[in-house]
């Protein structure tokens, strides 16, 4: 007879032992007892009781905390706990706001959030004074370090601090005279914050901590956390498996799973070799949602949207994502939408890239952009509504390949973008070109559905040579184009569909 747990009797001795454990647990310190540095007394009584009782009656998975599990309450010094515990320790963060932590993990450590656990890089500001309809508070020290290139109308994008009123980010303006509703100014010389909204009855927070997790440890796991309001500089991640932005190696094997990463200044998540970034919501960060470098990085099943809130120049580096110096990068089944910049962007020495099954919708610049890089497959993506923020020439493409070698594009739906599918040849002698000379060569575009794009599909160059059309092996074939008019580009001019076919493209 197949036995189930409900009809298995528990031996009397085991039952007695379970009762004894319950009695012992009732004596253990409560979770609000005075903390110890390593968090080792943090076993909530209810969790321990259930876990031990289950372990005595079943071999199924339980919530029993092992000797390397530490429980973290809001107010605990998490960085000190990490330093006091060995590699492979698991830290379970309790519900609530954990403020001010910047963590350098050790190898194999796990950081897991219970529902409602929030890591915040912000401090709460109170005690504002008011003068002429502007509120201000002193004593807010910061180095005021600027990094990045900004849009003309957002000249303070490069300062990492952000100000929030009831979780809404305000625009950082250049002077006190420009402060008004929805705007603020940080006078770095006087250490004073000026605010154009009455803070009475509101929660006002200033992002000041540069990162939540950083460093080059290996095999770190970060799971189930809300991570918000960190003052990460541009080109640095709030979660970052590097020591700094110049580090092109970093740690390997990070698992960044099922987190919410929002309202931070620089990059939401910056991953390196062997990382898996999956199931995260990465939204409304100041510069980029995601970045990666290294070998074998997987980006899968993330929702990436609304990034570049600080107003960085998206031609410099801003938007949904940017990947550089990768090999074997896989970007699969992500929803990438409404970013102020490109949606998915591989730029500089990427090789063996695969973009597959992504929904790339309504991004301000190109939907998918593969630039000064090498072998790639762009397959089975849905690409709609991208490129209207800058659609001059061929730059509003749903899918764009620029000065890159051996890229195959197939099975995509490319509809309603500024341009369709394009290849671009430029002089990029400034590029590292680590895998050989760069040019638009071997572009293989087939079996795509292309419809309703305002501009063109095809190939263009600005180097004064027609070789890209005649001898570089760039071709379109077996595609379905559902649009009339001169929506095709060849020999550096717009052509009709009939002329497109006569050039041997389809």
Named regions from a protein language model:
Residues 1-16:
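N-terminal export and membrane-targeting signals
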Residues 15-23:
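Bacterial N-terminal signal peptides
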Residues 22-46:
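C-terminal region of N-terminal signal peptides and the immediate post-cleavage residues
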Residues 46-51, 55-63:
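Extracellular mucin-like PTS domains
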Residues 56, 64-252, 497, 501-506:
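Extracellular polysaccharide-degrading/modifying enzymes targeting complex plant/algal/animal polysaccharides
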Residues 102, 211-213, 228, 232-253, ...:
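Glycine- and acidic/polar-rich repeat regions and solenoidal domains
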Residues 279:
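Active-site and donor-binding regions of nucleotide-sugar-utilizing enzymes
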């Amino acid at each position: 007879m197949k036995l189930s747990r409900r009809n298995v009797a528990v031996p009397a001795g085991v039952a007695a032992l379970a009762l004894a454990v319950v009695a012992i647990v009732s004596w253990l310190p409560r979770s609000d007892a005075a903390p110890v540095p390593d968090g080792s007394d943090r076993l909530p009584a209810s969790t321990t009781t259930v876990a031990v009782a289950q372990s005595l009656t079943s071999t199924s998975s339980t919530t029993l905390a092992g000797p390397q599990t530490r429980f973290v309450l809001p107010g605990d010094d998490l960085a000190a706990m990490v330093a006091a515990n060995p590699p492979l320790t698991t830290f379970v963060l309790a519900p609530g706001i954990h403020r001010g932590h910047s963590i350098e993990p050790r190898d194999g450590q796990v950081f897991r959030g219970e529902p409602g656990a929030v890591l915040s890089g912000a401090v709460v500001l109170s005690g504002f004074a008011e003068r002429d309809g502007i509120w201000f508070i002193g004593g807010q020290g910061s180095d005021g370090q600027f990094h990045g290139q900004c849009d003309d109308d957002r000249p303070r994008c490069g300062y990492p601090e952000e100000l929030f009123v009831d979780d809404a980010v305000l625009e950082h303006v250049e002077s006190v005279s420009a402060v008004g509703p929805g705007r603020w100014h940080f006078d770095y010389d006087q250490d004073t914050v000026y605010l154009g909204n009455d803070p009475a009855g509101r929660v006002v927070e200033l992002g000041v901590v540069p990162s939540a997790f950083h460093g080059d440890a290996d095999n770190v796991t970060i799971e189930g956390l809300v991570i918000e309001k960190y003052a990460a500089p541009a080109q640095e991640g709030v979660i970052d498996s590097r020591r700094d932005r110049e580090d092109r190696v970093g740690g390997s094997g990070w698992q960044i799973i099922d987190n919410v990463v929002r309202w931070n200044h620089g990059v939401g998540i910056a991953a390196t070799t062997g990382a898996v970034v999956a199931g995260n919501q990465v939204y409304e960060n100041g510069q980029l949602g995601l970045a990666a470098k290294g070998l074998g990085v997987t980006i899968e099943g993330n929702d990436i949207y609304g990034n570049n809130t600080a107003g960085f120049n998206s031609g410099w580096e801003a938007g949904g994502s940017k990947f550089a110096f990768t090999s074997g990068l896989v970007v699969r089944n992500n929803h990438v939408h409404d970013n102020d910049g490109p949606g998915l962007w591989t730029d500089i020495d990427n090789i063996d890239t695969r973009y597959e099954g992504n929904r790339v919708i309504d991004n301000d610049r190109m939907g998918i952009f593969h630039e000064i890089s090498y072998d790639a497959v762009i397959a089975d993506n849905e690409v709609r509504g991208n490129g209207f923020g800058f659609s001059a020439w061929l730059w509003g493409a749903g899918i764009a390949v620029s000065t890159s070698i051996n890229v195959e594009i197939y099975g995509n739906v490319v509809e309603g973008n500024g341009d369709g599918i394009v290849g671009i040849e430029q002089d990029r002698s400034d590029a590292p070109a680590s895998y050989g000379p760069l040019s638009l060569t071997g572009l293989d575009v087939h079996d795509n559905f292309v419809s309703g794009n305002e501009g063109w599909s095809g190939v263009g160059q600005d180097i004064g040579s027609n070789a890209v059309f005649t001898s570089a092996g760039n071709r379109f074939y077996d595609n379905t184009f559902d649009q009339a008019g001169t929506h095709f580009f060849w020999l550096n001019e717009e052509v009709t569909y009939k002329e497109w076919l006569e050039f041997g493209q389809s």
